[in-house]
Amino acid sequence: FLKHPATGQVVIVTAPDRREAAEGALGELHKDPRVVIVDGGARRQDSVLAGLEAASNSGLPLVAVHDAARPFVPQQVIASLVAAIQDGAAAALPVLPVVDTLKQIDSERVTSTTDRNALGRAQTPQMFRLPDLLTRHLGHPADREITDDVRLYEEDGSLIAAVPGDDRLMKLTTSSDFAMLSSLIAGTGEFDMPHEPPPIDIR
């Protein structure tokens, strides 16, 4: 994100007991004035809200909410998201086509085939106008879980843009995932890759 000219600030939300580990993982980037670390909450939506409130102090117009388990963000994806919001979308997210045949299953019994042409695989980062997303989070009932920020826009029919996703935005959850992605993008020069996979602690 810091390599993209549209980025004015990066807010990293972490569990309070992981703050020191987050600072250590950042290395020299921790000294970058654009990087801010804040404590998250018990739920995903609490952590997103903490990040949005911290970002709101920057005065920046747009915000991208991203999943740290997808560490490799192509510059073109960021550019496409920014362009979609500037063109009038209320929200934008990268989407990949569904390439596998999908089956409806009841227990262990296949009941039907689902039309995959109307489906897509949602990725992050997801981009919004910062003041608008903050307002929606603040106004959302506290007892209703938010697992995906775009859903706050689906409920009122807002224009949500789907931009082309990227396989390099795969979600890393195991060491084998890291090895696969390292092999995929080795030699491109687009990402700064560590020689060894970092400890993976998805919370």
Task: Report residues per predicted region.
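Conserved N-terminal catalytic core of the sugar/cofactor nucleotidyltransferase
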Residues: F1-L60
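Short active-site oxyanion
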Residues: T7-V11, A90, D167-L169
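Hydrophobic packing residues within well-ordered alpha-helices of enzyme cores
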Residues: A22-L26, L81, L102, L181
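Residue-level signal for inorganic ion chemistry
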Residues: G51, H66-D67, P97, R129, ...
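Short aromatic/hydrophobic "clamp" motif used to bind/position activated sugar donors
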Residues: L62-A64
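Acidic metal-phosphate-binding loop of nucleotide-sugar-dependent transferases
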Residues: A68-F72
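Conserved core of the sugar-phosphate nucleotidyltransferase
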Residues: V73-V163, I200-R203
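SAM-dependent methyltransferases
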Residues: D148-V150, D167-L169, S175-R203
